[in-house]
Protein backbone atom coordinates (compact mmCIF):
# COMPACT_ATOMS: atom_id res chain seq x y z
CA UNK A 1 0.00 0.00 0.00
CA UNK A 2 2.68 2.52 1.02
CA UNK A 3 4.85 1.75 -1.99
CA UNK A 4 2.05 2.15 -4.50
CA UNK A 5 0.10 5.22 -5.48
CA UNK A 6 -2.31 6.50 -8.09
CA UNK A 7 -0.43 9.04 -10.22
CA UNK A 8 -0.89 10.82 -13.54
CA UNK A 9 0.49 8.90 -16.55
CA UNK A 10 4.30 9.04 -16.78
CA UNK A 11 5.71 11.85 -18.92
CA UNK A 12 9.35 11.57 -19.97
CA UNK A 13 11.57 14.65 -19.54
CA UNK A 14 11.86 16.89 -22.61
CA UNK A 15 14.68 19.13 -23.80
CA UNK A 16 14.16 22.71 -24.94
CA UNK A 17 16.31 25.29 -26.71
CA UNK A 18 13.82 28.14 -26.32
CA UNK A 19 12.12 29.60 -23.27
CA UNK A 20 8.56 29.54 -24.64
CA UNK A 21 8.50 25.80 -25.32
CA UNK A 22 10.07 25.08 -21.91
CA UNK A 23 7.43 27.22 -20.18
CA UNK A 24 4.60 25.59 -22.17
CA UNK A 25 5.80 22.14 -21.04
CA UNK A 26 6.04 23.27 -17.41
CA UNK A 27 2.48 24.61 -17.64
CA UNK A 28 1.19 21.38 -19.21
CA UNK A 29 2.83 19.16 -16.57
CA UNK A 30 1.62 21.35 -13.72
CA UNK A 31 -1.95 21.40 -15.04
CA UNK A 32 -1.94 17.60 -15.44
CA UNK A 33 -0.88 17.25 -11.80
CA UNK A 34 -3.55 19.70 -10.58
CA UNK A 35 -6.29 18.02 -12.62
CA UNK A 36 -5.31 14.63 -11.18
CA UNK A 37 -5.44 15.84 -7.57
CA UNK A 38 -8.62 17.88 -8.01
CA UNK A 39 -10.49 14.98 -9.62
CA UNK A 40 -9.40 12.59 -6.88
CA UNK A 41 -10.35 15.12 -4.22
CA UNK A 42 -13.83 15.55 -5.71
CA UNK A 43 -14.27 11.77 -5.59
CA UNK A 44 -12.93 11.61 -2.02
CA UNK A 45 -15.34 14.34 -0.85
CA UNK A 46 -18.26 12.52 -2.48
CA UNK A 47 -17.42 9.37 -0.47
CA UNK A 48 -15.12 7.33 -2.70
CA UNK A 49 -12.55 5.31 -0.75
CA UNK A 50 -9.06 4.81 -2.17
CA UNK A 51 -6.98 1.73 -1.36
CA UNK A 52 -3.80 3.49 -2.52
CA UNK A 53 -2.35 6.94 -1.96
CA UNK A 54 -3.17 9.59 -4.56
CA UNK A 55 -0.13 11.62 -5.56
CA UNK A 56 0.98 14.16 -8.15
CA UNK A 57 4.29 15.98 -8.43
CA UNK A 58 5.70 19.40 -9.23
CA UNK A 59 7.43 19.95 -12.57
CA UNK A 60 11.16 20.63 -12.55
CA UNK A 61 13.58 22.50 -14.78
CA UNK A 62 17.21 21.40 -15.03
CA UNK A 63 20.32 22.68 -16.77
CA UNK A 64 23.76 21.07 -17.17
CA UNK A 65 26.58 23.56 -17.63
CA UNK A 66 30.11 22.69 -18.66
CA UNK A 67 31.52 26.03 -17.54
CA UNK A 68 30.53 28.89 -15.25
CA UNK A 69 31.62 31.61 -17.65
CA UNK A 70 28.91 33.39 -19.61
CA UNK A 71 28.73 32.85 -23.36
CA UNK A 72 30.75 35.44 -25.26
CA UNK A 73 28.60 38.24 -26.64
CA UNK A 74 25.57 37.51 -24.42
CA UNK A 75 23.24 40.51 -24.27
CA UNK A 76 22.46 39.55 -20.67
CA UNK A 77 26.05 39.61 -19.41
CA UNK A 78 25.50 42.87 -17.50
CA UNK A 79 22.68 41.41 -15.36
CA UNK A 80 23.24 40.07 -11.85
CA UNK A 81 20.91 37.08 -12.37
CA UNK A 82 19.99 34.53 -15.03
CA UNK A 83 23.20 32.49 -14.86
CA UNK A 84 24.95 29.92 -12.68
CA UNK A 85 28.36 30.54 -11.14
CA UNK A 86 30.17 27.28 -11.86
CA UNK A 87 29.90 24.10 -13.95
CA UNK A 88 27.47 21.42 -12.82
CA UNK A 89 23.88 20.22 -12.76
CA UNK A 90 21.30 22.71 -11.47
CA UNK A 91 17.64 22.00 -10.83
CA UNK A 92 14.54 23.39 -9.15
CA UNK A 93 10.87 22.53 -8.79
CA UNK A 94 8.30 24.98 -10.17
CA UNK A 95 4.75 26.00 -9.29
CA UNK A 96 1.99 28.29 -10.56
CA UNK A 97 3.52 28.79 -14.01
CA UNK A 98 0.48 30.95 -14.82
CA UNK A 99 1.23 33.48 -12.05
CA UNK A 100 4.99 33.27 -12.65
CA UNK A 101 4.87 32.98 -16.46
CA UNK A 102 6.75 36.21 -17.24
CA UNK A 103 9.32 35.53 -14.50
CA UNK A 104 9.98 31.93 -15.57
CA UNK A 105 10.15 32.87 -19.25
CA UNK A 106 12.78 35.53 -18.53
CA UNK A 107 14.87 33.21 -16.35
CA UNK A 108 14.72 30.37 -18.91
CA UNK A 109 15.68 32.76 -21.70
CA UNK A 110 18.64 34.15 -19.75
CA UNK A 111 19.94 30.70 -18.83
CA UNK A 112 19.87 29.69 -22.50
CA UNK A 113 21.48 32.95 -23.60
CA UNK A 114 24.19 32.76 -20.96
CA UNK A 115 25.05 29.06 -21.08
CA UNK A 116 23.67 27.65 -24.34
CA UNK A 117 22.70 23.99 -24.43
CA UNK A 118 19.19 22.92 -23.46
CA UNK A 119 16.76 23.18 -20.57
CA UNK A 120 15.35 19.87 -19.39
CA UNK A 121 11.75 19.89 -18.13
CA UNK A 122 10.12 16.94 -16.40
CA UNK A 123 8.16 15.68 -13.40
CA UNK A 124 10.04 15.88 -10.09
CA UNK A 125 9.89 13.61 -7.03
CA UNK A 126 8.49 16.47 -4.89
CA UNK A 127 4.78 15.76 -4.23
CA UNK A 128 2.22 18.56 -4.46
CA UNK A 129 0.33 18.82 -1.15
CA UNK A 130 -3.34 18.46 -2.01
CA UNK A 131 -4.21 21.75 -0.27
CA UNK A 132 -1.98 23.58 -2.75
CA UNK A 133 -3.92 22.13 -5.68
CA UNK A 134 -7.23 23.78 -4.76
CA UNK A 135 -8.39 26.75 -6.80
CA UNK A 136 -8.43 29.97 -4.76
CA UNK A 137 -12.18 30.00 -4.18
CA UNK A 138 -12.52 26.27 -3.45
CA UNK A 139 -13.47 25.49 0.14
CA UNK A 140 -13.54 21.72 -0.12
CA UNK A 141 -12.65 20.69 3.42
CA UNK A 142 -15.70 22.44 4.83
CA UNK A 143 -17.89 19.90 3.02
CA UNK A 144 -16.34 16.92 4.87
CA UNK A 145 -16.90 15.34 8.27
CA UNK A 146 -14.09 15.47 10.84
CA UNK A 147 -13.50 11.74 10.35
CA UNK A 148 -13.17 12.22 6.59
CA UNK A 149 -10.74 15.11 7.08
CA UNK A 150 -8.56 12.90 9.30
CA UNK A 151 -8.57 10.23 6.61
CA UNK A 152 -7.16 12.71 4.08
CA UNK A 153 -3.63 12.26 5.39
CA UNK A 154 -3.85 8.54 4.61
CA UNK A 155 -4.71 9.24 0.98
CA UNK A 156 -3.14 12.57 -0.02
CA UNK A 157 0.13 14.39 0.59
CA UNK A 158 -0.31 17.26 3.06
CA UNK A 159 1.96 20.31 3.50
CA UNK A 160 5.26 19.33 5.12
CA UNK A 161 6.92 22.28 6.84
CA UNK A 162 10.22 20.35 7.02
CA UNK A 163 10.39 20.58 3.21
CA UNK A 164 9.91 24.35 3.26
CA UNK A 165 12.93 25.75 5.05
CA UNK A 166 14.94 28.72 3.76
CA UNK A 167 18.30 26.96 3.57
CA UNK A 168 18.85 27.88 -0.08
CA UNK A 169 17.96 31.56 0.36
CA UNK A 170 20.02 31.74 3.57
CA UNK A 171 23.06 30.18 1.89
CA UNK A 172 23.18 27.24 4.32
CA UNK A 173 21.93 24.50 1.96
CA UNK A 174 24.59 21.94 1.00
CA UNK A 175 23.56 19.37 -1.63
CA UNK A 176 24.43 15.76 -0.81
CA UNK A 177 26.74 13.80 -3.10
CA UNK A 178 25.01 13.26 -6.44
CA UNK A 179 22.31 15.86 -5.76
CA UNK A 180 21.92 18.83 -8.13
CA UNK A 181 22.75 22.39 -7.12
CA UNK A 182 19.67 24.60 -6.51
CA UNK A 183 18.56 26.70 -9.48
CA UNK A 184 16.21 28.89 -7.43
CA UNK A 185 16.15 30.46 -3.98
CA UNK A 186 12.80 28.79 -3.23
CA UNK A 187 11.40 25.33 -3.96
CA UNK A 188 7.88 24.96 -5.36
CA UNK A 189 6.44 23.76 -2.03
CA UNK A 190 7.96 26.73 -0.18
CA UNK A 191 6.48 29.09 -2.78
CA UNK A 192 3.04 27.48 -2.56
CA UNK A 193 3.09 27.76 1.22
CA UNK A 194 3.91 31.47 1.00
CA UNK A 195 1.26 32.14 -1.65
CA UNK A 196 -1.32 30.61 0.69
CA UNK A 197 -0.07 32.62 3.67
CA UNK A 198 -0.15 35.86 1.63
CA UNK A 199 -3.87 35.35 1.04
CA UNK A 200 -4.38 34.77 4.75
CA UNK A 201 -2.25 37.66 6.05
CA UNK A 202 -3.05 40.35 3.47
CA UNK A 203 -6.61 39.43 2.53
CA UNK A 204 -5.73 39.66 -1.17
CA UNK A 205 -4.63 37.26 -3.92
CA UNK A 206 -0.90 37.00 -4.65
CA UNK A 207 -1.57 37.95 -8.29
CA UNK A 208 -2.45 41.50 -7.17
CA UNK A 209 0.94 42.18 -5.54
CA UNK A 210 3.03 44.72 -7.43
CA UNK A 211 6.81 44.91 -7.83
CA UNK A 212 7.19 47.95 -5.57
CA UNK A 213 6.16 47.15 -2.00
CA UNK A 214 5.86 49.63 0.86
CA UNK A 215 5.47 48.57 4.49
CA UNK A 216 3.99 50.75 7.20
CA UNK A 217 2.60 50.43 10.70
CA UNK A 218 0.77 53.76 10.56
CA UNK A 219 -2.88 53.60 9.58
CA UNK A 220 -2.92 57.21 8.35
CA UNK A 221 -0.44 56.27 5.59
CA UNK A 222 -2.82 53.52 4.53
CA UNK A 223 -5.76 55.94 4.62
CA UNK A 224 -3.89 58.33 2.34
CA UNK A 225 -2.86 55.52 -0.02
CA UNK A 226 -6.49 54.38 -0.27
CA UNK A 227 -7.57 57.95 -1.00
CA UNK A 228 -4.91 58.32 -3.71
CA UNK A 229 -5.84 54.93 -5.16
CA UNK A 230 -9.51 55.82 -5.56
CA UNK A 231 -8.57 59.24 -6.90
CA UNK A 232 -6.39 57.62 -9.59
CA UNK A 233 -9.30 55.38 -10.60
CA UNK A 234 -11.35 58.48 -11.44
CA UNK A 235 -8.67 59.73 -13.86
CA UNK A 236 -9.13 58.23 -17.35
CA UNK A 237 -5.52 59.16 -18.19
CA UNK A 238 -3.97 57.48 -15.14
CA UNK A 239 -1.31 54.82 -15.80
CA UNK A 240 -2.83 52.80 -12.96
CA UNK A 241 -5.43 50.27 -14.06
CA UNK A 242 -7.05 49.11 -10.82
CA UNK A 243 -7.03 49.51 -7.05
CA UNK A 244 -7.38 46.35 -4.96
CA UNK A 245 -8.31 46.25 -1.26
CA UNK A 246 -8.65 43.40 1.29
CA UNK A 247 -11.25 40.86 0.28
CA UNK A 248 -10.05 41.26 -3.34
CA UNK A 249 -12.35 44.25 -3.71
CA UNK A 250 -11.33 45.65 -7.11
CA UNK A 251 -12.02 49.17 -8.37
CA UNK A 252 -11.14 49.50 -12.07
CA UNK A 253 -10.00 52.76 -13.60
CA UNK A 254 -12.91 54.71 -15.10
CA UNK A 255 -13.63 53.49 -18.63
CA UNK A 256 -12.10 50.03 -18.14
CA UNK A 257 -14.41 46.99 -18.12
CA UNK A 258 -14.77 44.73 -15.09
CA UNK A 259 -12.98 41.37 -15.23
CA UNK A 260 -14.45 37.95 -14.47
CA UNK A 261 -13.18 37.58 -10.89
CA UNK A 262 -14.08 41.13 -9.83
CA UNK A 263 -17.54 39.95 -8.78
CA UNK A 264 -15.99 37.55 -6.25
CA UNK A 265 -14.50 40.43 -4.25
CA UNK A 266 -16.15 41.02 -0.90
CA UNK A 267 -15.32 43.39 1.97
CA UNK A 268 -14.27 41.13 4.89
CA UNK A 269 -16.19 41.39 8.19
CA UNK A 270 -12.89 42.33 9.88
CA UNK A 271 -9.53 43.30 8.42
CA UNK A 272 -6.87 40.58 8.10
CA UNK A 273 -3.70 40.60 10.21
CA UNK A 274 -1.64 42.61 7.69
CA UNK A 275 -4.00 44.20 5.15
CA UNK A 276 -2.64 44.66 1.63
CA UNK A 277 -3.59 47.39 -0.86
CA UNK A 278 -2.50 47.34 -4.48
CA UNK A 279 -2.35 50.18 -6.99
CA UNK A 280 -2.09 48.08 -10.14
CA UNK A 281 -0.10 49.07 -13.20
CA UNK A 282 0.74 47.06 -16.34
CA UNK A 283 3.22 44.20 -15.84
CA UNK A 284 3.04 44.45 -12.04
CA UNK A 285 4.89 47.79 -12.12
CA UNK A 286 2.48 49.43 -9.66
CA UNK A 287 2.68 49.86 -5.88
CA UNK A 288 1.62 47.58 -3.04
CA UNK A 289 1.28 48.89 0.52
CA UNK A 290 1.01 46.52 3.48
CA UNK A 291 0.06 47.54 7.01
CA UNK A 292 2.35 45.32 9.10
CA UNK A 293 0.89 46.52 12.41
CA UNK A 294 3.17 46.26 15.43
CA UNK A 295 5.94 43.84 16.29
CA UNK A 296 8.99 42.61 14.36
CA UNK A 297 7.46 39.13 13.94
CA UNK A 298 4.87 40.53 11.52
CA UNK A 299 7.53 42.26 9.45
CA UNK A 300 9.62 39.08 9.18
CA UNK A 301 6.56 36.95 8.39
CA UNK A 302 5.23 39.08 5.56
CA UNK A 303 8.62 39.72 3.95
CA UNK A 304 9.44 35.98 4.05
CA UNK A 305 6.24 35.34 2.09
CA UNK A 306 6.35 38.29 -0.32
CA UNK A 307 9.93 37.25 -1.17
CA UNK A 308 8.68 34.31 -3.27
CA UNK A 309 7.01 36.79 -5.65
CA UNK A 310 10.48 38.18 -6.44
CA UNK A 311 9.26 41.82 -6.53
Where are each of the predicted segments found?
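Accessory terminal and edge-of-domain segments that mediate assembly/interaction
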Residues: 1-311
Amino acid sequence: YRGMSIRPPFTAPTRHTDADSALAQVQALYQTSLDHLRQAMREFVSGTNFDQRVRAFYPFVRIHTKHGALKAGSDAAHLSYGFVAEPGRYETTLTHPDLFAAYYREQFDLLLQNHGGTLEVGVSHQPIPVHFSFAENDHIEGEMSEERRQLMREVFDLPDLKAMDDGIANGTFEPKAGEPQPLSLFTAARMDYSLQRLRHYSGTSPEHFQNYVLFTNYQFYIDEFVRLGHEAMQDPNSEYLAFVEPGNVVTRRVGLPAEANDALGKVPPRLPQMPGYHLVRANHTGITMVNIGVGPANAKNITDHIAVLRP
